[in-house]
Amino acid sequence: MNESPEKDQRHRERMERKKAVVDEKIAQARDERGVLLVHSGNGKGKSSSAFGMVARALGHGMKVGVVQFIKGAASTGEEAFFRRFPEEVSYHVMGEGFTWETQDRQRDIAKAEAAWKVAAQLLADPDVGLVVLDELNIALKHGYLELDRVLADIQARPAMQHVVVTGRGAQPGMIEAADTVTEMSLVKHAFKAGIKAQKGVEF
């Protein structure tokens, strides 16, 4: 494609201005500490993004803790993969399936309480660099756990430990406490077209 020299020059000037803005923001970001991230919303990718961070953390030699609060009725590709690294990843599947499958509130509460005991231990361990609390938002949304207690344990974690909380319906208090919040938006999903959940894509 033949571009005019004037167009090339305008592009270069725009990119120079953009680089200056980005460089300035990078220079101003001097605080270094563990961050709390929340992945919520109705779209696909909340847990997938969190497990991508697990892979990234492992690449940096960090130890990781994973607690799954709701999922657990069926095996997943991420569980099968990360269990290959027992020294680096402490992986705990504590749920018994989605809430509409269990249909037993008291049992769900008991499972969530047991899961939080495991999570609290990971959050107190200075050797663990990243903790993934998968579908914790669901447990909080249904009142299986007390938000104040959960936030207290998260905020008392080691200074450089990162935490990722996933699940729909993030509570306002969780959003307020978080450093980074991402709302996954559902634009289109294969399931609505009658396509079954696919291995390697959904699980």
Swiss-Prot record:
EC number: 2.5.1.17
Region: Disordered, residue numbers: 1-21
Keywords: ATP-binding, Cobalamin biosynthesis, Cytoplasm, Manganese, Nucleotide-binding, Porphyrin biosynthesis, Transferase
Cofactor(s) listed in the protein's UniProt record: Mn(2+)
A Gene Ontology term for the protein's cellular component: cytoplasm
Annotated ATP binding sites: G41, N42, G43, K44, G45, K46, S47
GO terms classed as biological process: cobalamin biosynthetic process; porphyrin-containing compound biosynthetic process
GO molecular function: ATP binding; corrinoid adenosyltransferase activity
Protein's pathway: Cofactor biosynthesis; adenosylcobalamin biosynthesis; adenosylcobalamin from cob(II)yrinate a,c-diamide: step 2/7
CDD domains per record: CobA_ACA
Localization of this protein: Cytoplasm
InterPro entries reported for this sequence: CblAdoTrfase_CobA (IPR003724), Co_AT_N_dom (IPR025826), P-loop_NTPase (IPR027417)
Reactions catalysed, as given in the entry: 2 cob(II)yrinate a,c diamide + reduced [electron-transfer flavoprotein] + 2 ATP = 2 adenosylcob(III)yrinate a,c-diamide + 2 triphosphate + oxidized [electron-transfer flavoprotein] + 3 H(+); 2 cob(II)alamin + reduced [electron-transfer flavoprotein] + 2 ATP = 2 adenosylcob(III)alamin + 2 triphosphate + oxidized [electron-transfer flavoprotein] + 3 H(+)
Subunit structure: Monomer.
Family, per entry: Belongs to the Cob(I)alamin adenosyltransferase family.
Family matches, as PANTHER family: CORRINOID ADENOSYLTRANSFERASE (PTHR46638:SF1)
Main function: Required for both de novo synthesis of the corrin ring for the assimilation of exogenous corrinoids. Participates in the adenosylation of a variety of incomplete and complete corrinoids.
NCBIfam families: cobA, PRK05986.1
Name assigned to this protein: Corrinoid adenosyltransferase
Species the sequence originates in: Pseudomonas aeruginosa (strain ATCC 15692 / DSM 22644 / CIP 104116 / JCM 14847 / LMG 12228 / 1C / PRS 101 / PAO1)
Gene: cobO
